[in-house]
Amino acid sequence: MALTQRLEFRQSQSLVMSPQLMQAIKLLQLSNLDLMTFVEEELECNPLLERASDDAAGAEAPTEVDQVSGDQLAEAQVRDARDGAMTTYTEWGGGGSGDEDYNLEAFVASETTLSDHLAEQLSVAFTAPAQRMIGQYLIDLVDEAGYLPPDLGQAAERLGATQEDVEHVLAVLQEFDPPGVCARNLRECLAIQLRELDRYDPAMQALVEHLDLLAKRDIASLRKLCGVDDEDIADMIDELRRLSPKPGMKFGSARLQTMVPDVYVRPAPDGGWHVELNSDTLPRVLVNQTYYSKLSKKIGKDVDKSYFNDALQNATWLVRALDQRARTILKVATEIVRQQDGFFTLGVAHLRPLNLKAVAEAIQMHESTVSRVTANKYMATNRGTFELKYFFTASIPSADGGEAHSAEAVRHRIKQLIESEEPSAVLSDDAIVERLRVSGIDIARRTVAKYREAMRIRSSVQRRRDNMWSTMNSRASGGTGLDK
């Protein structure tokens, strides 16, 4: 077989991800507070960029974002999605697996907060949109120590729900980790933790209900109320002291940032809804063309010319990217309001299922764009302030491409599999994934683990160990002959 050499020419098109284009994509994800910080840094380092003001001399208004730059941004996001860098709805805040240059976490450092931890459990505990909305509303009220306000009557009225609906969701929230969270006072916080430990008997209940006597060190009265002796009351008090009075503090003492809405939704005179951007969250910057023109006439060195040309290009791109970001947020928010009109008009019971794809198709944008826009953006409504992503509901895809499965149904199936497992054949999370896949449910192992933990089901290693101890204890009690 002879080897030959030949020259071939191939023509192809590809999108070059320029720094400016990467910047435009990143700006979509930033919260309004992070955006302000970013713009302040740009103002410090770019001499041609300045804040807009009524008497800004020599500054030109930002030019309309042309179709080419808009198409480039959309194409970049499509490519970004193909490369695995887009944030999907099922992994909110988790970031993608693409190049770290496109990862928001590499740009803005963050850590898990109590609110994030509770929100993650909420997504597993409820699949009904109305219950999720109530749950998120309550989570937003939780303070740094893990407590809710004593009176939640306004929550039902604000959301257009019944008091029973709110109480039902609250009862589930109070089963979340950390134990004792979402309590309305110290007594309720301690009672929740004691129930978790299966130690909330009548004597302990009496002790918790009379904490004022404990503060006064009136042990004699406590002993009488609890109906126990000196040794028991001492043990009970010691057990009470081992509980956490502030369960939320385990997540650190990071300062809570004020939630500033990006979008306002107000009733319109025609009976619809008026959606507008919060101008206070939109940095107003301009490119000072006059200053650049003066400098360009005086600059002699090529190095200096290159520096100021780059500064002009970066400033122009930033102004355009900010304008594009504002337009995109408004467009997405308006479509969400249109889709969720029932919620705004009638209340949480009328919150309809919605996904990123439905909004993306309606406004002719890519899902990755909608995903970025809905992260870290808040909407102030007549029913409270909500993050845009809360108006979406998730589902579990089918392994055979058929109809998607609800998260609640999948969670129930996982529980059934574990409850029916043989003590000698405990199912690992990987084994559960395979069982679900056979039944047509496509789910990741980490999702199975998350659902299992939210249901307070121990890991396969822990369940196997529990079975072993149970078997050993059974054999020991049956073979000692001490009952004779």
Swiss-Prot record:
Residues 468-477 have a biased composition (Polar residues). Residues 464-484 are annotated as: Disordered. A motif (RPON box) lies at residues 444-452. It comes from the Bacteria. InterPro entries: RNA_pol_sigma_54 (IPR000394), RNA_pol_sigma_54_core-bd (IPR007046), RNA_pol_sigma_54_DNA-bd (IPR007634), RpoN_core-bd_sf (IPR038709). Induction: Regulated in response to oxygen. The keyword Transmembrane does not apply. Residues 355-374 bind DNA. GO terms for molecular function: DNA-binding transcription activator activity; nucleotidyltransferase activity; sigma factor activity; transcription cis-regulatory region binding. GO terms for biological process: DNA-templated transcription initiation; nitrogen fixation; regulation of DNA-templated transcription. Keywords: DNA-binding, DNA-directed RNA polymerase, Nitrogen fixation, Nucleotidyltransferase, Sigma factor, Transcription, Transcription regulation, Transferase. GO terms for cellular component: DNA-directed RNA polymerase complex; protein-DNA complex. Belongs to the sigma-54 factor family. Sigma factors are initiation factors that promote the attachment of RNA polymerase to specific initiation sites and are then released. This sigma factor is responsible for the expression of the nitrogen fixation genes. This is RNA polymerase sigma-54 factor 1. It comes from Bradyrhizobium diazoefficiens (strain JCM 10833 / BCRC 13528 / IAM 13628 / NBRC 14792 / USDA 110).
